[in-house]
Amino acid sequence: MMKDKEHVIVGISGGVDSAVAACILIENGYRVTGLHIKVLDHSDDSLHLEKSPLIISDRKEFRFPVFSLNLSGSFRRDVIDYFLQDYLSGRTPNPCMVCNKLIKWKGLLKGADLLQATLVATGHYARIDCGREKCRLLKGTDSQKDQSYFLWMLSSEELSKTLLPVGNLTKQEVRELARRFGVRAAEKKESQEICFVPDNDYREVVKSSRPGLAEKLTGGEIIDTEGKVIGHHAGYPFYTIGQRKGLGISSPEPLYVNRLDPEKNRIRVGGKAMLQCRKLIAGQMNWTGISPPETSTRAAARIRYRDTGEACTIVPVEKERFEVIFDKPKQSVTPGQAVVFYRDDEVIGGGIIVEAISE
């Protein structure tokens, strides 16, 4: 990995992973500059960098300059507004992967341009393997921390300019390195929340964004698989596919949300078997490992972060849309989430789930 004094911009989040990534690069002979991207500053984007007082390590040899770049305006438009609109459209968004593409890498590459750096780096648990013709995105070595699912939107060109120094390490190894490097965040706990969703309660974020929305949608119908009204709900945006709790319905068998109907403010529920899907339709595709398939092709598909994957056939059905046919049914396929395709450890592409098909 060593390239003596090659200049790298490292995305600094304040956590242990990005700090260790920076220190690894320093130890390997890179010239490192940190970039902290501000996204919740309640102001518009800034086109200039500001010196940040952040100090990552207590050891002088692992100290480096850190700048901040304000992308709050872009974050509000490209991430928060998308997040809200998806819920209002009956979908379940994944803002972190959109943020990676449109905010983090946009900001890092902008910082690299302003500071005349050749590469960018982050603390993501994934790997990049660059050959003569292309760069491949691979799973991280630590299967419990692998974040390749969140990076499927990145282009081959973006991958070619990126280093992921902790991708071949386990979390325990990163903690151990952090202590050796004197990283101040060595013992910092990981946040499991979306950064703009307090207490991980997306419903309150949706409600506060649209005054009067909750009152307007309260009382919508809950129907069963035969169309019979069996209850009422608090508003379709506040439910997700596979949800069981909070329905307020008495039933001899557990009931789960299996469809949202924004036009009628209606949700449909049924037994667990109704969550099984053999197919899905995906759009907004990005292919990094292969060219867009013109005929059916095989892969393994993950439909959520912790999904272990399922063998499938990918079939082009129309421009920019593909049908994914699973070898075995998948549970709780959720429109708005990503389906990411793998061959062994390599991410070959992905897309956004448009429709789940139960037949």
From Swiss-Prot:
One of its GO terms (molecular function) is tRNA-uridine 2-sulfurtransferase activity. It catalyses: S-sulfanyl-L-cysteinyl-[protein] + uridine(34) in tRNA + AH2 + ATP = 2-thiouridine(34) in tRNA + L-cysteinyl-[protein] + A + AMP + diphosphate + H(+). One of its GO terms (cellular component) is cytoplasm. It is found in: Cytoplasm. Disulfide bonds join 99-195. GO terms for biological process: tRNA wobble position uridine thiolation. The active site is at 99 (nucleophile), 195 (cysteine persulfide intermediate). Its main location: cytoplasm. The keyword Iron does not apply. Pfam families: tRNA_Me_trans (PF03054), tRNA_Me_trans_C (PF20258), tRNA_Me_trans_M (PF20259). Its EC number is 2.8.1.13. Residues 145-147, 304-305 are annotated as: Interaction with tRNA. It comes from the Bacteria. ATP binds at residues 11-18, 37, 123. Belongs to the MnmA/TRMU family. HAMAP family: tRNA_thiouridyl_MnmA. This is tRNA-specific 2-thiouridylase MnmA. It comes from Chlorobium phaeobacteroides (strain BS1).
